[in-house]
């Protein structure tokens, strides 16, 4: 109705229908209103920016109805929507409750319209003035009621609202002009004095300072709070005083780009500060998650697998219950034991368990040749019922070719999650960019050594938390209170400490060799802090020096695993094939005693070349259980071992000199159980660097070398089965001829290379004018060339002879 009346008045009186004081000439002109009326568009406040009201209405502004926006990303603007009802009906009900409460109602007061200004946190409300009240009386009552009602809340200091009569003509706009505690007053007409400005604006809040209008043509008023500035802007803007119209708006926020300017103008300060803040955030956010992930990896508390202690306990209880029921029914379960060892290994398992129940404060080092069953003895026989175990495989870490692959493997083994290996490339580029801009490195990029060390430090904190999970600072016994230190608790409860198993530990590697040093130092800290038992599994005694440097002045607990004796190996195989003596006689292939005895002898003959190496015995048992005869199983195992030797040591991909050295040792060890180191030193292929060549072959698993006070002494096959494989390679005529021919050709190439070096030296000596000076050297070189030529001639003759056999 209001819009129709205004439109009708405009059509009757033309452009004079709307006066300046009524709608504010600055905001909307009569021409615009005329065009809107002719087009039939509504003259709403949101469309035109002007609030229209009649003489019987009053316009009030309520603040603190919505959370005001002091920035574009203020979070209260968003979560407040979830915490409170901000619908149009709810806001109207709230305003009416504040303006006319039940305790002091304004009879006949009618709320006609509300226009929310969510950016400023307030609402414009239009009320119809009752006939028995004047506009001033209604405004005073609404102000008093609002102040009284909003003060009743317990959070009144934060939620208190206020109502102010609108004296001017507010401009309803939704521009991106954020509220500020400083308002700018533009005056159309004669300027106002400071006293007049203070009198007009003070009622909305405490004013800190007033800056009169200067050459810029506007005055500035600084409030102590945002609320005062917002209310002044919405209630005073558009007012006309003494022929001057005041237009109030917020002073533009000049700090919008302060952070950007700080980074641009002070990069040497800003970039390290940003990196420090990011590091702090990463530590606060991700470190607790990573510690929890590592704890879960060790305890397996939330993993539904057989390694979970709870699942393991349930399975143990179930197995015991089933066995008890079967025993009551008279049925004996003759299933074979899952874990069987010969007597020597049983004693070692008992020793290892006893050490874990004590506070040794030192390393436990389990040493044995490759395939001796170190992993099985420790993990399956000793720690199978231990609740907290962390297993680390050094071989997986050492063989990681790229940095990201190394970090992923390390994180997977430790349980370190989350990890972002792709950040290495990004941080490296950022570091280069920062260095180009500032002239100094940012320190953002970290090497894989540093990141691996950080992983271990985080794991140490998790291990400590697990070890102290049952710790209580005080113990109450009646009226007595005993204080217990963490060190005393760990000393009294060694069973609470986790067990860290570090497998395939060595002292050096071609790549990622730092892993051994870092693990040794980390393990020494765990032992010194008395928060974990640490077990190292090694193939030789060479890593002992590295461990001694990490944990000096300590005597290690050593456990040496050797091959089983003939009787122990035979007993182990028979116990695996036929777990109980009654079943043994039933399951034998022959029914009579002679056949049984013959079968035993066949197994003994098969075990003779296999020896007592644990993994080979297990492979033999699996083959026999699958249906193979003992002799057939032995034959296939020898063929498999010989194929492994040819692929690793005698293939064309290997270095010629190393292949020739390997074949020479194969020939010697096929005829002798032991070869002395002194017999190898003076052979042509080993003469230049005998120790390096032998150690390389030992590292690759072809031979094993015993030492006497650190000096190489005896050379043996890496495992007993290899001796049979060596003999197999020599007995196979066709294969032996091919391999032997390759050996001679490599030996010829080796001697030819030596002759070339000597001939080059002879050319240099030939340029000397006085040959008498070099006579002794010339004779030496001539003798060496003669010797090498003799070797070449001998090898060529042998190659020709073998070619005739093919």
From Swiss-Prot:
One Gene Ontology term from the biological process aspect of the record: mRNA processing
Places the protein is found: Mitochondrion inner membrane
Ranges of the Mitochondrial intermembrane topological domain: 290-806
Keyword annotations: Membrane, Mitochondrion, Mitochondrion inner membrane, mRNA processing, RNA-binding, Transit peptide, Transmembrane, Transmembrane helix
UniProt keyword DNA repair present: no
Domain spans labelled RRM: 181-253
Protein name: Mitochondrial escape protein 2
Molecular functions per Gene Ontology: RNA binding
Role played: Plays a role in maintaining the mitochondrial genome and in controlling the mtDNA escape. Involved in the regulation of mtDNA nucleotide structure and number. May have a dispensable role in early maturation of pre-rRNA.
Pfam families: RNA12, RRM_1
Source organism per UniProt: Eremothecium gossypii (strain ATCC 10895 / CBS 109.51 / FGSC 9923 / NRRL Y-1056) (Yeast)
Primary location: mitochondrion
Gene expressing this chain: YME2
Transit peptide, residues from-to: 1-25
Membrane topology: Single-pass membrane protein
Family: Belongs to the YME2 family.
């Amino acid at each position: 109705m209001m819009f129709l009346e205004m439109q009708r008045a405009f059509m009757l009186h033309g452009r004079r229908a709307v006066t300046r004081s009524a709608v504010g000439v600055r905001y909307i002109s009569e021409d615009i209103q005329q065009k809107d009326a002719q087009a039939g568009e509504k003259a709403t406040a949101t469309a035109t920016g002007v609030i229209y009201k009649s003489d019987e209405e009053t316009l009030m502004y309520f603040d603190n109805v919505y959370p005001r926006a002091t920035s574009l990303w203020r979070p209260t603007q968003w979560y407040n929507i979830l915490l409170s009802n901000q619908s149009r009906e709810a806001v109207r009900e709230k305003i009416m409750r504040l303006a006319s409460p039940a305790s002091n109602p304004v009879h006949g007061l009618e709320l006609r319209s509300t226009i929310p200004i969510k950016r400023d946190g307030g609402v414009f409300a239009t009320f119809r003035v009752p006939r028995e009240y004047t506009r001033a009386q209604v405004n005073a009552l609404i102000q008093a009621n609002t102040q009284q009602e909003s003060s009743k809340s317990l959070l009144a200091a934060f939620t208190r609202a206020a109502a102010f009569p609108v004296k001017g003509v507010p401009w309803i706009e939704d521009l991106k002009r954020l509220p500020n505690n400083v308002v700018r007053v533009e005056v159309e007409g004669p300027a106002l004095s400071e006293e007049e400005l203070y009198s007009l604006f003070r009622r909305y809040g405490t004013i800190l300072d007033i800056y009169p209008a200067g050459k810029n043509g506007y005055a500035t008023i600084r409030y102590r709070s945002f609320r005062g500035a917002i209310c002044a802007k919405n209630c005073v803007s558009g007012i006309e005083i003494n022929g001057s119209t005041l237009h109030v708006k917020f002073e533009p926020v000049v700090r919008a780009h302060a952070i950007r300017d700080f980074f641009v103008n002070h990069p040497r300060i800003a970039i390290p500060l940003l990196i420090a803040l990011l590091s702090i955030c990463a530590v606060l956010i991700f470190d607790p998650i990573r510690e929890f992930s590592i704890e879960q990896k060790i305890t397996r508390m939330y993993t539904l697998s057989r390694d979970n202690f709870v699942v393991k306990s349930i399975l143990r209880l179930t197995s015991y219950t089933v066995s008890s029921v079967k025993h009551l029914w008279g049925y004996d379960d003759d299933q074979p034991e899952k874990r069987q060892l010969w007597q020597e290994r049983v004693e070692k398992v008992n020793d290892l368990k006893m050490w874990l129940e004590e506070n040794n404060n030192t390393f436990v080092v389990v040493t044995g040749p490759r395939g001796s069953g170190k992993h099985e003895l420790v993990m399956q026989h000793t720690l199978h019922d231990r609740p907290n175990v962390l297993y680390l495989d050094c071989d997986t870490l050492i063989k990681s070719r790229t940095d990201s692959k190394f970090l992923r493997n390390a994180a997977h083994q430790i349980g370190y999650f989350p990890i972002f290996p792709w950040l290495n490339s990004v941080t490296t580029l950022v570091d280069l960019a920062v260095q180009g801009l500032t002239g100094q490195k940012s320190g953002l990029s970290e090497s894989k050594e540093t990141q691996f060390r950080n992983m271990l430090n985080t794991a140490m904190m998790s291990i400590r938390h697990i070890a102290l999970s049952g710790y209580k600072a005080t113990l109450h016994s009646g009226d007595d209170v005993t204080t217990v230190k963490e060190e005393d608790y760990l000393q009294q409860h060694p069973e609470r400490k986790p067990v860290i198993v570090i497998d395939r530990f060595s002292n050096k590697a071609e790549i990622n060799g730092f892993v051994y040093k870092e693990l040794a130092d980390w393990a020494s800290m765990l032992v010194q802090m008395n928060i974990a038992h640490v077990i190292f599994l090694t193939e030789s005694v060479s890593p002992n020096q590295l461990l001694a440097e990490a944990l000096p002045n300590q005597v290690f607990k050593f456990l040496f695993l050797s091959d089983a004796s003939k009787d122990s190996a035979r007993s182990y195989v028979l116990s695996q094939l036929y777990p109980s003596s009654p079943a043994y006689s039933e399951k034998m292939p022959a029914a009579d005693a002679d056949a049984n005895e013959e079968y035993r002898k066949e197994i003994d003959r098969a075990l003779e070349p296999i020896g007592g190496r644990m993994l080979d015995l297990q492979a033999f048992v699996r083959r026999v259980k699958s249906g193979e005869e003992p002799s057939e199983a032995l034959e296939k195992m020898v063929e498999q071992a010989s194929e492994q030797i040819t692929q690793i040591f005698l293939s064309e991909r290997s270095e010629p000199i190393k292949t020739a050295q390997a074949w020479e040792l194969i020939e010697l060890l096929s005829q002798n159980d032991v070869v002395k180191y002194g017999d190898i030193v003076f052979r042509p292929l080993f003469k230049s660097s005998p120790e390096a060549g032998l150690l390389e072959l030992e590292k690759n698993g072809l031979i094993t070398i015993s030492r006497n006070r650190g000096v190489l002494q005896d050379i043996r096959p890496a495992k007993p089965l290899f001796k049979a494989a060596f003999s197999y390679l020599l007995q196979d005529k066709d294969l032996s001829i091919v391999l032997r021919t390759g050996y001679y050709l490599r030996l010829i190439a080796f001697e030819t290379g030596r002759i070339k070096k000597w001939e080059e030296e002879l050319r240099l000596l030939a340029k000397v004018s006085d040959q008498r000076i070099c006579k002794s050297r010339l004779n030496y070189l001539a003798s060496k060339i003669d010797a090498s030529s003799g070797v070449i001639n001998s090898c060529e003759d042998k190659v020709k002879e073998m070619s005739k056999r093919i």
